Regions:
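Sec-dependent signal peptide recognition
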Residues: 2-8
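C-terminal motif of bacterial Sec signal peptides marking the signal peptidase cleavage site
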Residues: 15-16
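Histidine-rich, glycine-flanked metal-binding segment
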Residues: 24-32, 40-85, 100
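Hydrophobic residues on conserved beta-strands that form the core of alpha/beta folds
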Residues: 35-36, 60, 271, 363
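Divalent-metal coordination cores built from histidine and acidic residues
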Residues: 77-82, 86-87, 91, 97-207, ...
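Active-site environment of divalent metal-dependent phosphoester hydrolases
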Residues: 94-97, 121-124, 214-218, 246-252, ...
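Active-site neighborhoods of metal-dependent hydrolases
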Residues: 153-156, 161-164, 168-188, 192-215, ...
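Divalent metal-binding pocket/active-site signature
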Residues: 200-258
Length: 379
């Protein structure tokens, strides 16, 4: 697999402010498509400007006001925006793209690049991990014909996919590969083995290391482990990107961990979906932004992405305490049914509901169809 390169423009354009644009077709033309009179936002952060955009084949041929050449197709984008394709920074679309590579739900919203790897990536996989994936969610494949991350993305591309794709290598994925689901510190030998897996993924084109530290078994990795893996990423100019270890009461401490990883590993770092979760902790967000600004003034390359609404979405893995989940899914289920363990679990869950009342939690999906019919839409 070749390393993914981000282009300034995708030749797939999106225009807004009207459900349809006026089009005309010409036979003798200098270009395949000319989009006329739209407000161009070129991705640089500069102000939009009125211009025409001419496309030949799969490349932008020319941008400028009132272009003279005609297009085989002429699109009037007056009053509309012309933009580069959008990047889905945190995509979980790998399995759905295996089933249907057309990606209509994202393409029709203007997304032209899917970036995987928030802690978990499609590779590298062991035989045990493949068996687990087949039992859960692997698209329509009856087998998983890849091992490495590069092989996974090549398999997806060969099946056919409408978007561009890229991936971080998942810190969770390499930990499961080497350590499993045990809640313990990795040994020096295991760190070396994980580093080798990260190096292989970077050689194949991974864009960096992704972590998701509120979930098990990612939560079992200490900061030193993440620094060791990030140092490998730094050798290739990659970034460390993280769903930080806390987004509520320990938000600032969690950010401190990310900044330490960036400093000691010598890499740029990105915060996934920057936010302060739960209303009692919203006030922490201003302090966090100040810390990021200070780090950037000190020369650290730290950035963040954010969504624009005050809600979040996760599954039971983000709600059930990570100590319950140690050992993997079967051990987790057994522990939840243990009459000795259940009182401690209920106490932990009740403590969480003090700051996150249950009426603010909406149930939206179940793997079990009968449970879905009964509970979807309820709080």
């Amino acid at each position: 697999m070749k390393r993914t390169t981000l282009l300034l423009f995708s030749t797939l354009f999106f225009w807004s402010c009207s459900p349809t644009a006026n089009t005309a077709v010409n036979i003798n033309s200098a270009y395949d498509v000319v989009v006329r009179n739209g407000t161009v936002y070129d991705g640089s952060g500069s102000e939009g400007f009125i211009a025409d955009v001419a496309i030949s084949g799969d490349r932008i041929a020319k941008i400028g006001p009132k272009l003279s050449g005609k297009g085989k197709k002429e699109i009037d984008a007056t009053g509309m925006a012309i933009t580069p394709g959008f990047i889905n920074m945190l995509s979980w679309a790998f399995n759905s793209l295996l089933r249907d590579g057309l990606s209509q739900s994202d393409i029709r919203q203007g997304v032209t690049l899917e970036v995987f790897g928030e802690g978990n990536s499609p590779g590298p996989l062991s035989d045990a991990m493949k068996s687990e994936m087949l039992g859960w969610n692997s698209g329509d494949d009856s087998e998983i014909p890849w091992v490495t991350l590069g092989e996974a993305l090549t398999h997806l591309e060969n099946k056919g996919v409408s978007t561009n794709v890229a991936s971080f290598v998942g810190a969770t994925t390499v930990r499961i590969h080497v350590v499993g689901y045990e809640n313990r510190k990795a040994t020096p030998e295991e760190i070396s083995e994980m580093q080798a897996l990260v190096r292989e993924a970077m050689e194949e084109g991974a864009v960096g290391l992704g972590s998701s530290l509120i979930y098990a078994p990612a939560d079992y990795a200490d900061t030193d482990e993440l620094i060791s893996l990030s140092k490998v990423v730094g050798e290739y100019g990659g970034r460390y990107i993280s769903h930080m270890r806390s987004e509520d009461k320990d938000l600032l401490k969690a950010y401190g961990e990310l900044e330490r990883i960036a400093r000691e590993a010598g890499v740029g770092a990105e915060i996934y979906h920057l936010k302060a979760s739960r209303e009692p902790y919203w006030k922490l967000l201003d302090d966090l932004i100040d810390l990021v600004d200070k780090a950037r003034e000190d020369g650290l390359d730290i950035s963040a992405d954010m969504y624009t609404y005050n809600a979040s979405s996760t599954g039971l893995t983000g709600v059930i305490p990570t100590w319950v989940q140690e050992g993997g899914h079967e051990a987790w289920m057994a522990r939840m049914q243990d009459p000795v363990v259940r009182p401690r679990l209920m106490k932990d869950l009740e403590a969480e509901l003090v700051v996150q009342p249950p009426e603010g939690i909406l149930l939206v999906g179940f793997r079990n169809e009968k449970m879905g019919e009964k509970y979807v839409g309820m709080t």
